[in-house]
Structure formats: C-alpha cells, structure tokens
C-alpha cells in the first residue's frame, strides 16, 4: 500500500507588508514568496529566492497566513508556477476566503490557475534579457480582474 504525501512547497519567506504594485497598492498584504525561478531577468530584485528556502505544507502556510491577520494574500517568487503544488495552495487560500493574487512572469501556463485568483502577469521587455520567454498566447486567458505588469528599463523597452 502506498501513502500519498501532502503537497509541499519550497518557501523563501512569508511576511506582512503593504502591497506596492498593481491595483492593490497600499493594501495590507501577506506575501508568500516561493523559491525558484527559471528566468534570470537583469533587473530582478528577488534573486535571493532563486535557491534555498524550506519545504512547507499547505496547511502550515495557511496557518502562518492566518496568524498575520490580513485578507489579501499575494503568492509571488521567484516564479510560483514553477512549483506544481502552487495550484493546490492557491485553491486552499481561496477556499479559506482570502483575496488571492498571483505574481507570475508570463513564461508559464496559466491554464491550471484557479479562476478566483487575480493573475498579475509580468510581461518581459527586451531590457529584461528574457523577452523570448514570454508566452503571449497566455494573455488571452486573462480576464477583466487580471493585470499586466511591464517593467520599463530603457527607451528601447518603451518603444518596444
């Protein structure tokens, strides 16, 4: 008889702060920063999340989120979609009545993301060094509550 292990995710940090981006700017938010990213954007401000981290169960993550006493949770990285168990985490957070957003690079499929999650897609410009990783067809899956983020690093990015 085999035993199925509960899903776990590699976690860099969980903290409470004010959201500084997207339409929730200024809103108290719990950030769940997952470890790992397949991209290496030149301007990345979270390279510390590429490696390391600790394995956490979804139950433990939700318990910690609950302790921080806010209603908005942002799952970020790294690239959260690089961890297959992120989908179970997103659904569990939504089931627990949190408003959930997902910050993603736009380089991975959005098909399995829970429809209750607000997707914030960071479309990569040439200045990122990762423009070829954009999955433009994924933008068709966005709805009216989802958002696109574009980091402009130069005039060339702006003109792009």
Question: Where are each of the predicted segments found?
Answer:
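Conserved AdoMet/S-adenosylmethionine-binding subsite of the radical SAM
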Residues: 81-160
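Radical SAM enzyme core and accessory elements
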Residues: 1-6
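N-terminal pre-triad scaffold of radical SAM enzymes
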Residues: 7-43
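Residue-level preference for alpha-helix termini and adjacent loops
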Residues: 13-17, 23, 30, 47-49, ...
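Short hydrophobic/aromatic-rich motifs at helix boundaries and adjacent loops
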Residues: 34-35, 62, 133-134
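Anionic group-transfer/hydrolysis microenvironments
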Residues: 15, 35, 47, 76, ...
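A broad, structure-centric signal for solvent-exposed, well-ordered loop/edge residues
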Residues: 18-21, 25, 41, 51, ...
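Conserved Radical SAM active-site core
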Residues: 9, 28-29, 39-117
């Amino acid at each position: 008889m085999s035993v199925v292990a509960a899903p776990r995710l590699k976690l860099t940090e969980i903290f409470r702060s004010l959201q500084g981006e997207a339409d929730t700017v200024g809103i108290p938010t719990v950030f769940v920063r997952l470890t790992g990213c397949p991209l290496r954007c030149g301007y990345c401000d979270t390279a510390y999340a590429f490696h390391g981290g600790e394995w956490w169960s979804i139950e433990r993550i939700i318990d910690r989120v609950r302790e921080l006493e806010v209603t908005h949770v942002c799952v970020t990285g790294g690239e959260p979609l690089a961890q297959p168990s992120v989908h179970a985490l997103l659904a569990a957070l939504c089931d627990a009545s949190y408003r959930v957003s997902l910050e993603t690079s736009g380089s991975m499929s959005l098909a399995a993301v829970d429809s209750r999650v607000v997707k914030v897609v960071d479309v990569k410009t040439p200045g990122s060094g990762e423009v070829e990783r954009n999955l433009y067809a994924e933008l068709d899956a966005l709805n009216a509550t989802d958002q696109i983020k574009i980091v402009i690093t130069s005039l060339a990015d702006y003109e792009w």
